[in-house]
Amino acid sequence: MNRNGATPTRGRGKRAIPNPPRRRARGKSVERGSTPLQYVTTLGPSRPRMGQGQGWQKLSHEEIILQVNSSTAADTIQTIPIIPRLSVPAGDKPIYSGSAPHLRTIGSAFAIHRWRALSFEWIPSCPTTTPGNLVLRFYPNYSTETPKTLTDLMDSESLVLVPSLSGKTYRPKIETRGNPPELRNIDATAFSALSDEDKGDYSVGRLVVGSSKQAVVIQLGLLRMRYSAEMRGATSISGVSA
């Protein structure tokens, strides 16, 4: 009892529980969470992607198919036939240029191909400004005469750039959706011997690469081809697929 004769009562309120110490949030430090930026472009072959569907063998890949060197005599004009078995033998004055080792290996095992994606990227070799221009021009046939000068290649269908600058991609206008043309496979040597009309049964077209005349002979750059192709059928032992 207290002095007034009353019995002290106990408070009915709940005793406050002190807040537990907050856990320190784990921040994502730069060392742990970030991924270092990649500044280097790999020029070597990447891992190809392959699959199957509806009787077709699918292949997606990218390859360096051509090294472009300058000439001191005149503008350089090179023609690349768009065929899976691309491997042009070296010669004094070959008609065609280019080589795609992985695509050639796969293409040699099949008789028929069709394209699902196709583009070309220029990779300069000279870090400084190189005078002149580089031109990429796709022709969907072989009957049109190949231009002999750089200016004749320059039109609304071509890509014109400075050889020392990269980052430009050239996409030929070919049918890739739905049911694109099914073409036969053939090696480069047998393909060169065909008439211009018959080449249309094996190739969707040709890429012409032109570069300006230079004061000295130098390597201007590399041409990379990115592609997605589908193939099927058996091949024969000859250069032409059955």
Swiss-Prot record:
Which ranges are annotated Basic residues under compositional bias? 11-27
Q: Which UniProt keywords apply?
A: Capsid protein, T=3 icosahedral capsid protein, Virion
Q: Where in the cell is it found?
A: Virion
Polar residues biased stretches = 35-44
Q: Where is this region: Disordered?
A: 1-54
GO CC, sorted alphabetically, is: T=3 icosahedral viral capsid
Read off the Pfam families from this record. Viral_coat
- One GO molecular-function entry: structural molecule activity
- Which InterPro entries does this UniProt record tie to the protein? Capsid_prot_S-dom_vir, Viral_coat
Q: Which residues form a coiled coil?
A: none
Q: How does it assemble?
A: Homomultimer.
Function, as annotated, reads: Capsid protein self-assembles to form an icosahedral capsid with a T=3 symmetry, about 32-35 nm in diameter, and consisting of 180 capsid proteins.
What family is it from? Belongs to the icosahedral plant coat protein family.
The molecule here is called Capsid protein
Species per Swiss-Prot/TrEMBL record: Panicum mosaic virus (strain United States/Kansas 109S)
